[in-house]
């Protein structure tokens, strides 16, 4: 960052020299970016620019310096989310769009049409850079030292007056710089440099390295920190899923769940979403890992199989393995969403009188839907269209699954940021500590119950018997369904993961 000597004065100096921008846009009609592009767009750009110059004219003097930036919002045809790129050569625009799309959503569709949704122009009235006087060197020495908290402990740091901070020499953090309107903290891992115009430049000297000092041994404070970090990752995945989904079920009813898992498919943390999703998702993740033991970076999988961790077929789970730079599987992120329809003998894919799974819709069994970062649209369409009762609106299924892929990609990015901050050993250790702590708390809760055996029986509407016996011994509990009737010839059977 760059900090001038007036930065503490209500940011007035920065506002006074900042550029003034005007933004205008016009609908582009959805033409293919590959061309030919409509000739009327040139006229549209010129008209938008003229409107911007007119709007800023009263702030422009005779020596005004103008800047104009033409941009377009691109999207894959049939989708809602558009990304801004610079106007230019069609091939360059598509390349920039796909790079942004891969970073934001985790995949690209190289064979799909990219359309121009919006024409945009930014008209800029550039501020005047002040001719600040050169400053004379001071003593170049700190006036004293003080103690402050940095990198998990108390450290001794030099305290400089701004006028005595060295010119042209980097000072490593931790350090404090005092001026008339504020205090600047140069943290560990950063360095400060004052130039001859009295600007103080603070830069990251350990970019890309893990800087947080933390041990792999469990610490109660860090346990809570990591618990909330992982939970926050799942919550932010949910925000992306809600924002990018198309269906009412996911976008408005919020019938979805997101979670973070270890490399074995064990649940580490989840957002406060749908309990039946979260309790069963680990089995779906493990089923994917067993079906694809050699998963590679850039792969994403989908499943809704009730025999492998699913619930009912409309609940579709998207699973993204997370690998390190050497291609070793380290974590997994997953999202499950209730799709409005996946086929079956009735709309909604929850028929009251179905007698087989295929009567409830399309079954997706650990299917790879992203390979090497490319979305496998045709493969997924064929799977949704398979069987006697295919999905009724596969376009909506695809849109929501793409939203789930994007949500997972957010989780991948946030886990990568956590690794940069703490390092792999610490992150993996605290995943295990969180799981151990959860097991310990559960055991304590069971230990508070009196030892003994408790039984209950009930029957479904069709007369099928359900029997359960719970036996508590110390800190352990056994739940036994012996005596329950076998699976029946209707749709009232519970998958093992949901039981």
Set out the residue ranges of the language-model regions:
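C-terminal, non-catalytic interaction/recognition modules in large multi-subunit enzymes and RNPs
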Residues: 3-499
